[in-house]
Structure formats: C-alpha cells, structure tokens
A protein has these predicted regions:
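Conserved phosphate-binding/catalytic region of the ribokinase-like
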Residues: 1-20, 26-27, 31-32, 39-55, ...
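Short, conserved phosphate/pyrophosphate- and ester-handling motifs at nucleotide-, phospho-/glycolipid
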Residues: 103, 239, 306
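Conserved N-terminal subdomain of the carbohydrate kinase-like
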Residues: 56-57, 75, 80-85, 105-189, ...
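Glycine-rich phosphate/adenosyl-contacting loop at the front of the ribokinase-like
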Residues: 3-4, 8-10, 18-22, 26, ...
Length: 363
C-alpha cells in the first residue's frame, strides 16, 4: 500500500460516506487521482466494493519453511565423535512457521505460505496451525515429497553445536506458484519472507510494488540468495555473520556492525536490526544507527530466539512502535524464547513480553 493510499483509506475508515471530492480537498490532490487510488485499493482488497465497504481483516503474511524439529540436549559436556547421554525433543519448526506461530501467540492475524508433504508430519503442522490460529489455506501440500526435517544438537550451554536440515520441499515454492498468490501478498499489511525458498521466487516477491517486506536471512549460505537485491527489503534482521555476507564487512566489533548497517541502508534497506547475540543489537534507519546492550539471560535453548526476535519486530511495526521500542520489544521476545526448551515458548504473549522487557531493564 502506498502512503497516499494509506491516507485515503484512513479518511474512509473515519467517514465511510466521504465523497471523492472531499477526499481530494483534504489531501489537496485531484479528484481523478482519488478515483485511481480507490480503484487500486479495491484491486488490493482493502475496499470490498462500492459504498466504501472496508476490509478490516488486516493480516501479516509469512512465506517460508515449515518442518519438524528434532533437538538433542546433552546432560553433560558435549563430546564430539562420541555417543552422548541426553534428552531428545521433537517439535514443529521452520523459520517461517516459527515466526508465524510467534505472531499468532502475540494475537496477530497471520497467514502462512509454505510447502509440506501429505504425510504424518505435514498433517500435524496443519492441525497445529489451525489450533493456534495460523491460516495455511494458501500453502502447498504435495503427495510426492516429504515434510522438511531439521535436526540440531545443542551443547551444554544451550547453544547449537551442529545441525542438519532436509528442506528440499521448499524448492516447490516456485515462481509460478508464488505468482498465483500475488493478490494475497500485495494485500498483506506486512509480508515476511525467509531465505529457505528459491532465489528466483525471492526475486519475484522483491519486485512486487507497495509491499512492506521483512526478511529473515536464515543462514550465511542462504543469505547469499538475496545479496544482489537486498535493497528491495523494508526491514532485515541479519546476525553478524549474515551481515558479513551481505556487506563484505567483518563484523567483529560494534563499530564494524554500525558500518555494516550503514552499507545495508545505503543499498536501499529502510530498517536494519543487526543481532550481535549476547552483545546486543545494532539497529538503524535513515535517522541514525544505535546500539542496545543485551541484558544477561539464562539460556536453555537458543534455537528459536531469532524467529521470536523477528516476530517481535513485526508486531512492533504494525503497532507503530519507534525503532528503539521495536528493538527492545523484540529483544524481550527473544529472551522468552531463550529461556524455553521448546523452539516456540508457550509463554509468548504480549503481556509476558512487556513484563520481560521490564525485568530486563529495557523499559
């Protein structure tokens, strides 16, 4: 949605009986221009028909991976090339799906476009999504491929030691399929994409006009997919290693993190939140680049922290939080994820995130 379309829609929300002449007068534009903008709003689904019937069912769309997570937690210090005694936990995961579930737990109306197999794991993902409030009606379900699986082994500190993923099914989210979802994408308030989907598909999404695109770079290898068109994204959340891939700057300290942010902003990204892990977050937009330290958090499982952080950024954006407030809310959401053995914490609520932010001294 363009800024002008947003202005017109706000006027219509306040007064559904307002005329095009009155809108033109208030915004100091031609009535013919108002007519064009209203036609575009109807095409995008924000206005449902004549009489200015407004579609108030705003939603966030997430496009990305969904899979089954199998995690191993050692009971003692992790010994490589040896059998370790520990605990195995299976849960639903995938960067896109995780972001969508965190958003649903934050009471955000969310749709998920992903690819799953018509198998036991795929049906489990569909059932859970329905129960938690994630709309997967636009996802791809195939009978000739398996639902993605992600296996991770954590060390004694709760950090990931090694992981294996089989996510070939994400390649099924191809250009033709995503083009068939063009209206759903363009009608979203925010569209979140992760780099598990093919580069060609990411390029098609990035070229869509008037779509607020949030990007999760996922990993250093997958971040390379978007390096050449990173400036098409509104908001990105790389870690220091992914930022190095995108900028060529070795992010070994705060100054270099700020330089990396500056490079990304100069490429066209509107907002950058560069995660430095336990060292905090460097964030910036056209008004400047800043840093917030991360208060000490007890880490049980670091796997889902980045997904929770991005969900916190999306929640903050659609609720008009400032950059600083967005970073703090996202950090508190990540802290809740860090303290949970599950990839998605069942304590992820708006109230709990705000409480955690206060406990951490972020507000």
């Amino acid at each position: 949605m363009t800024n002008r379309e947003r202005e017109i829609l706000e006027l219509i929300k306040k007064n559904p009986f307002i005329t095009q002449e009155e809108i033109a007068s208030k915004l100091n534009i031609a009535r013919a221009s108002v007519a064009v903008h209203i036609t575009n709003l109807m095409k995008k689904g924000y206005i449902l028909g004549k009489g200015y019937i407004i579609n108030l069912d705003e939603y966030v769309l997430v496009i990305g991976g969904a899979n089954v997570d199998i995690q191993g937690f050692p009971k003692e210090k992790l010994r490589y090339k040896d059998s370790n005694i520990g605990i195995l936990n299976m849960s639903l995961g995938g960067v896109g799906r995780n972001i969508a579930e965190n958003l649903a737990r934050l009471n955000v109306n969310v749709k998920l476009i992903t690819a799953i197999g018509d198998d036991m794991y795929g049906r489990k993902i569909l059932e859970h999504s329905k129960n938690i409030g994630i709309d997967m009606s636009h996802s791809l379900v195939v009978s000739d491929d398996n639902t993605s699986t992600y296996l991770s082994i954590l060390d004694e500190d709760g950090d990931m030691a090694v992981a294996l993923s089989c996510m070939d099914i994400c390649d099924r989210i191809g250009v033709d399929f995503i083009k068939s979802k063009k209206k759903i994408i363009e009608s979203s308030k925010v569209c979140v994409v992760d780099t598990n989907i093919p580069k060609e598909t990411l390029e098609v999404i990035a070229e869509l006009e008037d779509v607020v695109l949030f990007l999760d770079t996922v990993s250093t290898k997958k971040a390379q997919k978007v390096k050449d068109f990173i400036g098409k994204f509104h908001t990105i959340k790389p870690n220091r290693y992914e930022a190095e891939v995108l900028t060529g700057i070795y992010v070994d300290n705060v100054d270099n993190a700020k330089k990396a942010c500056e490079v990304l902003l100069n490429k066209g990204v509107q907002r950058v939140f560069l995660s430095l892990g336990e060292d905090g977050v460097v964030f910036g937009d056209s008004r400047g680049i800043f840093k917030i330290d991360m208060p000490k958090v007890y880490v049980v499982n670091a796997t889902g922290a980045g997904d929770a952080f991005l969900a916190g950024l999306v929640f903050s954006y659609i609720n008009d939080y400032s950059m600083e407030a967005s970073a703090k809310f996202a950090m508190a959401a990540a802290a809740i994820a860090l303290s949970s053995k599950d990839t998605i914490s069942n304590k992820m609520t708006i109230q709990n995130v705000n409480t955690k932010a206060k406990e951490m001294g972020l507000c």
